[in-house]
Amino acid sequence: MVKVVIVNGRPGCGKTTFEQICQDICFPFTSHIGFSPDHSLAISLCSTVDFVKHIATLCGWDGTKSLENRRFLSDLKGLLTTWNDVPFKKIQERVEALMFDRKIDWILFVDCREPAEIQKLKERLNATTVLIRREEVEYDEVSNHSDADVFYYDYDLTIFNNSDIIHLEDEARKFIEYMKKEEVPHYVNAD
């Protein structure tokens, strides 16, 4: 079973930190996959811009996330989405690859910013949506519509990251326990 979790939040809100804490709670296996001690739950991380970043690197992008580079990545993702829905197809391929491991239940964290893309992932992959909020970054300057439109979606869950790492770890533990529940939506291949 694969439970897809769409994660969003403004730059610097702690999305990656939250995801990594969730991995650590489920026992770290590698930098991208975390298994629980009983080996019945695994966590994998990806983003709708992973493939976009690969293409950007081929075009000379140096991997930095300046305002100009964030705008470039956002625009490139928009082009790939309009052309052939490439970012969604790459996420769907990832989910279907995880479906082959029937001995383990997966939580796949997918970082995604655009409300329309979030809704598409939610509908097509039966995903749960999570917003990470951190007050100190909510009014920072952004360079692109993807970062600016973070709050224009009604998320299933909101996690507040306004305190210290211990508080965020507690929120991550609660989240993992919630995701273990059977009634949480999961992906079912239509084939």
Describe the predicted segments one by one.
Residues 35-105, 113:
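ATP-dependent small-molecule kinase phosphotransfer cores
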